Regions:
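Short, exposed beta-strand-loop hairpins at the edges of beta-sheets
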Residues: 157-160
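Basic, often amphipathic N-terminal segments
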Residues: 1-68, 89-148, 166-174
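Long, low-complexity, Ser/Thr/Gly/Pro-rich intrinsically disordered segments that act as flexible linkers
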Residues: 75-76
Length: 174
């Protein structure tokens, strides 16, 4: 089975991202992820049994408090991805890194630079074959203010089923 571990962005920032992704698809044909607004904790991986992951995440969530982060403005990876820029507080970054340390103890979780501790935290707007419309898309989103106070208050595991990501389980911090 294929899984991905994310933190779903909720509240005004999550709604903003979900609506903006729909808007840029309708106006410019820019496609995005099938996941809700999120930042990635662990990129997709394969596993047959994730009962040990379930226990790790339950224990972690029960013993950690939600932390603040900000989303402010936009950024991009070359002309391939446009995203909302995430600015982690010191406490939020520590929470993330402690979570990574727990996850990497599992035998089927292998991190790469792009999803390890020093990843570029971001909430994707569009990432599917946007090179031809990149300039227009970049100009479009930059005319829309983007600034939100957020909480890293959940870890959500999604499972790939029926050609889409479906929520397997959400773990809420204290």
């Amino acid at each position: 089975m294929r899984y991905v571990i994310v933190s779903v962005v909720k509240g005004p920032a999550g709604n903003f991202n979900n609506n903006l992704r729909k808007e840029v698809f309708e106006k410019l044909g820019a496609k995005s992820s099938k996941l809700p607004a999120h930042f990635t904790i662990k990129a997709p991986f394969e596993a047959d049994d994730i009962s040990d992951l379930d226990k790790v995440l339950q224990d972690f969530a029960q013993n950690h408090k939600a932390q603040d982060y900000k989303i402010k403005g936009y950024n991009h990876f070359d002309n391939r991805v446009i995203y909302m820029d995430v600015h982690m507080s010191k406490e939020c970054k520590i929470l993330h890194d402690e979570l990574i340390e727990e996850l990497e103890k599992l035998p089927y979780i292998h991190f790469k630079n792009h999803d390890y501790k020093d990843k570029v935290f971001h909430v994707t707007i569009s990432s599917k074959k946007i090179q031809k419309i990149y300039d227009e898309l970049w100009e479009y989103v930059n005319n829309i203010p983007c600034e939100f106070d957020c909480k890293f208050d959940n870890v959500s595991v999604f499972k790939w089923e029926d050609n889409t990501w479906k929520l397997y389980k959400e773990y809420l911090f204290m």
